[in-house]
A protein has these predicted regions:
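Aromatic-lined carbohydrate-binding/catalytic grooves of carbohydrate-active enzymes
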Residues: 123-245
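Catalytic and substrate-binding clefts that recognize carbohydrates or anionic sugar/phosphate headgroups
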Residues: 1-127, 135-138, 144-145, 149-156
Length: 245
């Protein structure tokens, strides 16, 4: 199909949904577990849990009829799961080709087994990583006392805890991500981590592959050519999360 307005080419497929057939999958979503009635775009975006956007989109779904479908496409795939027509799953891509695989079961476990054998299986993470994690999340003003209050709150509620995660403000604001603890709020990070580990916790910190212009190391990275550049040789920057990212 060609969009006559912009001359872009699209390919799509429609597969039948039986009466009572329910669809699951398509990666991380913050909507209903059953995907029927939803329109899903498998394009990674940082939208938060109150939106239909997600970090971990996967163009694979399975149904309670004992099969799965994997759309093998590296770009955005749009799924209409019984939303345009209740008896159809439609998926489309902006391309001149469309490749997909139907994976038989007959059970959900068998579908997932064949799917992961086909796509490849990652190494098994350590056992502790499957435990309960607690994060500072969007807390923007916190220190060791705040962290301990969160951890103590879990203990008071008799909730197990295995990993504590420091969100972005363990570093100085708008200097993300230079791997430097904010000395005002965390003057003794090594000691703090030892104290947290003494409680039997694993520690995780928030990082991302970018650096803010406000960080003291930005100039050094720029001079040494470590930063991403545009085709014309200029530095690639934007202001989405912080100035001069």
């Amino acid at each position: 199909v060609q969009d006559t307005n912009n001359q872009r080419n699209y390919m799509f497929e429609r597969l039948d949904l039986g009466v009572g057939e329910t669809v699951y999958g398509l990666g991380e979503r913050f909507t209903a577990l059953v995907r029927n009635g939803q329109t899903v775009e498998t394009w990674n975006r940082d939208g938060g849990t109150s939106t239909e956007q997600a970090y971990k989109n996967i163009p694979f779904y399975m149904t309670n009829r004992g099969y799965g479908v994997l759309v093998n496409h590296p770009q955005c795939v749009s799924f209409e799961v019984g939303s345009e027509k209740v008896s159809k799953v439609q998926f489309s891509v902006e391309s001149e080709y469309l490749e997909y695989f139907v994976i038989d079961g007959p059970t959900p476990k068998a579908v997932l087994d064949r799917y992961t054998r086909f796509t490849g299986r990652p190494a098994l993470p350590p056992a502790w990583s499957f435990g309960l994690w607690l994060t500072t999340s969007f807390t923007t003003n916190y220190d060791e006392a705040t962290v301990n209050s969160f951890i103590d709150g879990m203990a008071e509620r008799n909730l197990p805890l295995h990993v504590f995660h420091f969100d972005c403000f363990w570093m100085k604001a708008f200097q993300w991500c230079d791997f430097e603890w904010d000395p005002l709020t965390f003057p003794d990070p090594e000691g703090m981590i030892r104290r947290l580990k003494a409680k039997g916790l694993k520690i995780c910190v928030w990082i991302n592959p970018y650096i803010g212009q406000k960080s003291p190391v930005f100039k050094e990275l720029q001079e040494k050519g470590y930063l991403l550049k545009r085709p014309d040789g200029s530095l690639w920057q934007w202001d989405k999360w912080q100035p001069g990212l």
